[in-house]
Amino acid sequence: EIPLRLVGSEMCIRDRIATRTSLIIDFGGGLKQEDDLEIAFESGAQMVTGGSIAVKNPEMFTSWISKFGSEKIILGADAKEKKIAISGWEETTSQELIPFIKGYYDKGITKVICTDIARDGMLQGPAIDLYKEIRDEIPFLYIIASGGVSSIEDIEKLSEAGIPAVIFGKAIYEGKIQLKDLLRFT
């Protein structure tokens, strides 16, 4: 493992994106200590997402919520069959998805990126029922759905289900969603 503070090329790229665009940057992956967050924020990230760290070191992750504020810390909740997966999806834990998210909501988290691993990159449609279940259980949580989006209709269905944000990639790369089609959601 390479500590985040030694990964100069990623910091340089993030810095260039931050200074040359008006994009809001969320940095995730490899956050293991407070210094990593400081560097991410100094390099232009407005938010950071912690997933594995929230499982492996909940005290540290909770301290980040207190120190940096819930508007800057996003919980990453990657799930396989409603169990939390960590370490780049290499390990599935015994922690149930919704109680895991609820526990951090009770500690101040206001945003979660929830990825249904089985659907990610598969273009089979998002896990709308799963996101509705989370929304029903934790109504004031800002849910960012991830995984499975294959069309603009999928995004519409998420919006209709009360899911305010979505992450997708493959549908853009494969031309199934055009950027111009997204303008109606702004």
Predicted regions and their residues:
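C-terminal helical cap(s) of enzyme catalytic domains, especially alpha/beta-barrels
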Residues: 60-68, 159-186
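Single conserved hydrophobic/aromatic residue that forms the stacking wall/gate
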Residues: 1-8, 12-13
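Conserved anion-binding
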Residues: 45-120
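Short acidic, glycine/proline-enriched helix-loop-strand junctions
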Residues: 23, 68-71, 138-142, 184-186
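Catalytic cores of alpha/beta
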Residues: 14-17, 21-47, 129-165
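A cross-family glycoside hydrolase active-site/sugar-binding cleft signature
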Residues: 26-28, 51, 74-78, 115, ...
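Short loop-to-alpha-helix "cap/lid" segments that border enzyme active sites
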Residues: 14, 90-114, 125-140, 144, ...
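Short, small-residue-enriched loops and turns at beta-alpha junctions
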Residues: 9, 83, 119-124, 174
